[in-house]
Amino acid sequence: MEYNTSQLCDIYQDQVDVVEPMFSTFGGRSSFGGLVTTIKCFEANGIIRQIVKESGVGRVLLIDGGGSLRRALIDADIAAIAADNGWEGIICYGSVREVDALADLEIGIQALASIPVGADEDDTGDSELPVNFGGVTFLPEDHIYADTTGVILSPEPLDIE
């Protein structure tokens, strides 16, 4: 499904939070949206690898990586697992790597930057908790919508018809 965050903001301006502009698009899908699943981890992606093995149909993985630009939390392998399991997209407050491979995958991916250094593979981190960055608090079960213009958050699903 295609999402236009500008139109959604025009229609639902009093109902959405707008995330501060900071993300670049890396995945093969330029717009995506769904129910938020949160992860908080720092320079380690084992917990991410575990979560993307779950069914992601209708879900967006939102990762608070502490804004780290030193190690990539998302690589082609993790993103491919997520795409294979139906995840709509990944928003990473952190870095990605293997950018050319990410662009070939049928999943939306937004992150702060790319770097060739991979993250540690330990399972350090937590999931399904409130996280805060970009001037917004993200709660599990919120609904998030992203495109090349920006990222918006709503406590309820938005009617895009």
Curated annotation (Swiss-Prot):
Alphabetized UniProt keyword annotations: Cytoplasm
InterPro entries referenced in this protein's UniProt entry, alphabetically: RraA (IPR010203), RraA/RraA-like (IPR005493), RraA/RraA-like_sf (IPR036704), RraA_gpbac (IPR014339)
Gene Ontology terms: biological process: regulation of RNA metabolic process
Cysteines engaged in disulfide bonds, as pairs: none
Subcellular location: Cytoplasm
GO cellular component, one term: cytoplasm
A GO molecular function held by the record: enzyme binding
HAMAP family linked: RraA
Function text: Globally modulates RNA abundance by binding to RNase E (Rne) and regulating its endonucleolytic activity. Can modulate Rne action in a substrate-dependent manner by altering the composition of the degradosome. Modulates RNA-binding and helicase activities of the degradosome.
Subunit structure: Homotrimer. Binds to both RNA-binding sites in the C-terminal region of Rne and to RhlB.
Family note: Belongs to the RraA family.
Protein name from the UniProt record: Regulator of ribonuclease activity A
